[in-house]
């Protein structure tokens, strides 16, 4: 097997089938016909002389050889993408791509403003914003699928030695009430008042929920006594429910700026209790860092930093393979952007 027995297209097809769980959905994702996908897999299996899928069940299941090829295939695809981006930087071509990851609240309310500022300075750079759970976002950075990310939770333990994690900003979490709620008239509310409220919350596994429970417990508030009447899967749904008078909720203050201006929600300070969490910037120091990501780190991140121990951008450029040049890439006005949103955090 001296020649390489597969192509990048075949690796992309394998990855799509593994992700989608079926040949048909993979074909739809790749905008090709199902017979074309099946033929490529058959050719690949013939070249490798091993089956890559168990075809007995309703869902396409990878064999041991399939898992092995998928593992290396994802690395090959990522390295090819990094190579193309490095060559773009070397030739100083117009354009380029910046891929930013974020957990839900950060990605929904903070990152669009940051990306807007970046696009004003670099309109020809394509920006992709991927909004997922903290865990999935961290793995995206580790695997080289995301240039950098801003998260509100903790990096998974298994990645803490792989990624560089630096404090970036403080995010204040506030108790919100309907504007006509009786407690909305008080300057502050007592801890005991919390036990009388009906709460609307994200699910118990969300990052914000865990932070709130931890801080309230530190403030000698028994979170088990709080009445969770409803669990929703997005901050927007929670805000709408509170506006409709269905209960109270804890949300990031960055998520309710518009509602406060319109006077449709009320923040109720809790006496002697402040709820804050630290937002962190994460990068993979062992991956190539493009000029676009270097410019974003140096020029945009400091404009929004609020943490007392906030990052020094130069600490993110220790890797000799990173791009230390944040020069402007192109001066066109046809920049593109995309947003990918997944699960709650």
Curated annotation (Swiss-Prot):
Location of the region described as Disordered in the Swiss-Prot/TrEMBL record: 311-345
Q: Mind listing the GO molecular function terms for this protein?
A: DNA-binding transcription factor activity; transcription cis-regulatory region binding
Annotated HTH lysR-type domain ranges read 6-63
GO annotation, biological process: regulation of DNA-templated transcription
**SUPFAM superfamilies, alphabetically?**
Periplasmic binding protein-like II, Winged helix' DNA-binding domain
Basic and acidic residues composition bias: residue spans:
328-339
The stretch of residues making up the signal peptide is: none
Give the annotated DNA-binding region, as residue ranges.
23-42
Which Pfam families would you find in this protein's record?
Answer: HTH_1, LysR_substrate
Which keywords fit this entry according to its UniProt record?
DNA-binding, Transcription, Transcription regulation
What this protein is reported to do is described as: Trans-acting transcriptional regulator of RuBisCO genes (rbcL and rbcS) expression.
Q: Which family does it belong to?
A: Belongs to the LysR transcriptional regulatory family.
Q: Which PANTHER family match?
A: HTH-TYPE TRANSCRIPTIONAL REGULATOR, HTH-TYPE TRANSCRIPTIONAL REGULATOR CYSL
- Provide the protein name: Probable RuBisCO transcriptional regulator
Source species of the chain:
Synechocystis sp. (strain ATCC 27184 / PCC 6803 / Kazusa)
Q: Which gene encodes it?
A: rbcR
């Amino acid at each position: 097997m001296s020649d390489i027995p597969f192509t990048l297209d075949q690796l992309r097809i394998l990855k799509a089938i593994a992700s989608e769980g079926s040949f048909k959905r993979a074909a739809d994702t790749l905008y090709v016909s199902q017979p074309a996908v099946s033929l490529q897999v058959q050719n690949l299996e013939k070249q490798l002389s091993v089956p890559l899928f168990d075809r007995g069940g309703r869902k396409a299941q990878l064999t041991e050889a399939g898992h092995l090829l998928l593992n290396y295939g994802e690395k090959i695809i990522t390295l090819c993408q990094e190579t193309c981006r490095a060559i773009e930087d070397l030739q100083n071509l117009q354009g380029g791509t910046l891929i930013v990851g974020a957990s839900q609240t950060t990605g929904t309310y903070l990152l669009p403003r940051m990306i807007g500022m970046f696009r004003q300075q670099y309109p020809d750079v394509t920006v992709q914003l991927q909004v997922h759970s903290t865990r999935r976002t961290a793995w995206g950075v580790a695997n080289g699928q995301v240039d950098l990310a801003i998260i509100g939770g903790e990096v998974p333990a298994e990645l803490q030695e792989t990624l560089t994690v630096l404090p970036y900003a403080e995010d204040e979490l506030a108790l919100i009430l309907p504007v006509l709620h009786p407690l909305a008239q008080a300057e502050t509310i007592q801890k005991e008042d919390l036990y009388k409220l009906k709460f609307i919350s994200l699910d118990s596994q969300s990052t914000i929920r865990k932070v709130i429970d931890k801080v309230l417990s530190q403030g000698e508030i028994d979170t088990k006594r709080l009445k969770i009447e409803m669990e929703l899967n997005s901050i927007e749904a929670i805000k709408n429910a509170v506006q409709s008078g269905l209960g109270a909720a804890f949300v990031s203050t960055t998520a309710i700026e518009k509602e406060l201006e319109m006077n449709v929600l009320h923040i109720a300070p809790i006496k002697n209790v402040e709820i804050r969490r630290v937002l962190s910037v994460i990068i993979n120091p062992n991956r190539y860092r493009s000029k676009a990501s270097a410019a974003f780190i140096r020029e945009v991140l400091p404009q929004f930093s609020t943490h007392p121990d906030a990052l020094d951008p130069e600490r993110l450029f220790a890797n000799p393979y990173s791009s230390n040049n944040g020069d402007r890439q192109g001066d066109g006005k046809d920049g593109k952007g995309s947003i990918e949103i997944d699960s709650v955090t």
